[in-house]
Design a protein with these regions (language model features):
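Small/aliphatic-rich secondary-structure junction motif
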Residues: 2-73, 170-234, 242, 253, ...
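Active-site beta->alpha loop and helix N-cap motifs at the rims of alpha/beta catalytic domains
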Residues: 79-90, 98, 110, 114
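Short glycine/proline- and acidic residue-enriched helix-loop micro-motifs
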Residues: 71-81
């Protein structure tokens, strides 16, 4: 995890904030700063000027359509100017939040395909990176999530928010599906709880009663008899993922920590039900 590198004083422990538009989600940016603050790491704000926009502007038939339905010719110079102003504005916004949280910040601007730019940034200074997506991920864009995990190798986790995100303060909800993920999630949750406030709550997620009983035994054995941590059980055969998101909402969750490729977020990246109800950031570990 990123915390091991950050605590050792190495420069590679960082949060890479992926900025690709002029309308990032405020909760996503705040969450990225909070993760860096919790793990004593730095932030690299990576603003990507989408190369496809420049290619499009090179065509003589390219037009920009305003909200009032007016059109005008789209030139490469116009795109370059707007991108530069947008990037400067976003970098100042991130800088203000990072300074207030006493988090070191590096700013970088590249012109590339957004996913490839992220992959290159993490490969150049990795592998202990947490990627934070500044744009809210729409529920129907789960395939993009799978693409990121498959393409961007130099990461230990990915933070994202959905369109309903509204807070980062509150309980840290660790959704545990296997004993192997317990300790990394627990350490991450405890670090984040000290910064964000609230308690760490473990939700044991399974798909059958037998799996639930086995996981419960393994988790309690690992925690020890003296642990006072709040433990909850949830079986996916009971209802849809949206109902689990409702449980998290009622717990006043400020962050959810989960595992990519499991029951919470399947490998196909289907987030439709979960993101229609989730009101806090989702921190996915590999």
């Amino acid at each position: 995890m990123i915390m091991h590198v950050a605590e050792a004083g190495e420069r590679r422990g960082r949060v890479v904030l992926h900025l690709t538009s002029g309308h990032p989600n405020a909760i996503a940016i705040e969450a990225a700063v909070r993760i860096a603050q919790a793990f004593n790491s730095e932030i690299e704000s990576l603003f990507v000027e989408d190369l496809q926009l420049y290619d499009l502007a090179s065509y003589p038939f390219a037009r920009e359509i305003s909200l009032s339905a007016r059109t005008r010719a789209l030139s490469r110079d116009d795109v370059e100017k707007e991108m530069r102003l947008c990037g400067q504005s976003l970098q100042r916004r991130v800088e203000t939040l990072a300074r207030a949280a006493d988090v070191p910040l590096r700013a970088k601007v590249v012109r590339d395909d957004p996913v490839q730019a992220l992959a290159k940034a993490c490969a150049e200074d990795g592998p202990w990176n947490v990627v934070a997506l500044a744009d809210a991920l729409p529920p129907g864009q789960g395939a993009r999530l799978s693409e990121l995990f498959n393409t961007v190798a130099g990461t230990t986790g990915l933070m994202l928010v959905g369109p309903m995100a509204r807070r980062t303060r509150g309980s840290i909800i660790a959704v545990v599906e296997t004993p192997e993920h317990l300790q990394p999630m627990l350490r991450a949750g405890e670090r984040m709880a000290r910064v964000l406030g609230g308690e760490v709550v473990l939700i044991m997620l399974s798909d059958s009663q037998s799996s639930d009983e086995w996981l419960d035994g393994q988790v309690r054995l690992a925690l020890g008899e003296q642990s006072r941590m709040r433990l909850l059980h949830y079986r996916t055969d009971q209802s849809a993922p949206a109902a689990l998101a409702e449980v998290i909402r009622r717990l006043n969750g400020g962050f959810v920590i989960g595992h990519f490729g499991g029951l919470l977020v399947p490998a196909d990246g289907d987030l439709r039900d979960l993101f229609t109800a989730l009101e806090c950031p989702l921190f996915l570990m590999r």
